[in-house]
């Protein structure tokens, strides 16, 4: 049985990812609040996807708690088909796209260059996530063992240790203080692109997702029991992030781009904000789901009474889908729940296609000389979300008619 809270978390994360990428348009208005919302407070999204991935792997790993051996070959075959194949296909697609629209020389089809692009996730700016995800898959036996160690020890204490490690490692990797001038090209590339492939940057979040899968009922019960504390943690993490950015701009003279390069998801503020956001969004989605279900249950008797007697006879039964539509109509919670669920259902394709639509949108703005304002950036965000969703729905229908394309671009048979 699928966990709808985790499923719907994908939709929340996609809204954040699109917010980060539309943030490039927010530079023109030079509005601090707008840029903060899009480029800083949307950065919970990428780490949260690793939380979802950790949850998914632990749910499907039947031998995790028992300690039985993992069939690594079968495990990797499934992951390479589900994630590796779409990554390869979309990387080549974007390389071809940029080769067609950019001047000669910007994209090279030299085999070594293609391998370089694929290894570091440079086909397009959003594809590095897939590289890190594949490295999480490849190194899963290590994290599987770590999960078992944590489970058999004191979980809160081990999570605190992991949190401290994450803070220290992320601080070092973003402030290495190393001079790479004399390094070989290969070593320099591995160091310069470390954020594009090292899974250690998101280890705490990934492991937390795995633990949530093992103890989901306890996890959600704790969120409900301490809902006020969860909201306070979330609000405090937002306040710290916002205060740090405000001080950086007003006191230290940072530009908006400096903010994005400093207070990202790997910064101490960003890590705390990610943890607070995950707890809050899981709590909010649980509340939203229970509210929608309660609304459906309370309206069910009224809906049945309002239907003519003939409609409820054996000759004209009330179908489940019609009943669901009647009971959920007019409910704000149900509408919001359905909107998030729809985004979640198409989140994978939305992730892959939205940079393409954003490039078209930006090109149109440049062509017609449209100058960005706060309202236009906000409208662009809405257009990109809706356009990516519509395009993903069309692609899904097209892929149903071509199984090969479906396998290549979604990893699904």
Regions inferred by a protein language model and the residue ranges of each:
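Kinked, hydrophobic transmembrane alpha-helices enriched for aromatic residues
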Residues: 2-32, 45-56, 81-102, 131, ...
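Interfacial loop-to-helix transition and helix-capping segments at the boundaries
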Residues: 36-46, 118-132, 174-205, 240-279
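Hydrophobic cores of alpha-helical transmembrane segments in multi-pass inner/ER membrane proteins
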Residues: 47-56, 128-137, 201-213, 272-283, ...
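Alpha-helical transmembrane segments and terminal signal-anchor/GPI-anchor hydrophobic tails
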Residues: 220-304, 313-318, 322-342
């Amino acid at each position: 049985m699928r966990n709808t809270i985790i499923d719907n978390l994908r939709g929340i994360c996609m809204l954040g990812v699109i917010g980060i990428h539309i943030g490039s348009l927010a530079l023109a208005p030079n509005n601090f609040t707008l840029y903060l919302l899009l480029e800083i407070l949307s950065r919970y999204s990428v780490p949260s996807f690793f939380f979802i991935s950790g949850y998914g792997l632990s749910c499907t790993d039947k031998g995790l708690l028992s300690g039985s051996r993992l069939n690594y070959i079968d495990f990797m075959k499934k992951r390479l088909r589900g994630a590796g194949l779409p990554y390869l296909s979309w990387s080549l697609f974007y390389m071809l796209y940029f080769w067609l629209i950019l001047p000669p020389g910007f994209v090279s089809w030299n085999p070594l260059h293609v391998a370089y692009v694929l290894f570091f996730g440079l086909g397009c700016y959003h594809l590095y996530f897939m590289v890190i995800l594949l490295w999480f898959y490849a190194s899963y036996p290590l994290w599987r063992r770590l999960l078992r160690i944590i489970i058999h020890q004191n979980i809160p204490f081990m999570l605190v240790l992991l949190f401290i490690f994450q803070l220290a490692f992320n601080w070092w990797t973003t402030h290495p203080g190393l001079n790479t001038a004399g390094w070989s090209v290969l070593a320099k590339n591995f160091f310069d692109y470390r954020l594009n492939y090292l899974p250690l940057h998101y280890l705490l979040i990934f492991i937390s997702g795995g633990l949530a899968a093992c103890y989901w009922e306890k996890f959600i019960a704790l969120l409900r029991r301490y809902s006020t504390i969860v909201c306070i943690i979330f609000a405090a993490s937002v306040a710290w992030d916002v205060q740090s950015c405000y001080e950086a701009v007003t006191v230290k003279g940072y530009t908006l781009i400096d903010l994005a390069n400093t207070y990202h998801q790997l910064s101490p503020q960003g890590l705390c904000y990610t943890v607070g956001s995950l707890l809050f969004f899981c709590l909010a989605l649980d509340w939203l789901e229970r509210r929608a279900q309660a609304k459906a249950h309370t309206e069910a008797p009224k809906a049945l009474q309002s239907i003519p007697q003939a409609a409820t006879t054996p000759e004209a039964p009330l179908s489940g889908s019609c009943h669901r539509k009647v009971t959920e109509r007019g409910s704000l919670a149900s509408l919001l729940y359905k909107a998030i669920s729809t985004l979640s259902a198409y989140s994978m394709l939305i992730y892959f296609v939205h940079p393409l639509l954003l490039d078209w949108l930006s090109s149109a703005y440049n062509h017609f000389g449209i100058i960005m304002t706060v309202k236009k950036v906000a409208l662009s965000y809405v257009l990109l979300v809706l356009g990516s969703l519509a395009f993903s729905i069309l692609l899904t229908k097209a892929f149903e008619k071509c199984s090969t394309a479906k396998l290549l671009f979604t990893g699904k048979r």
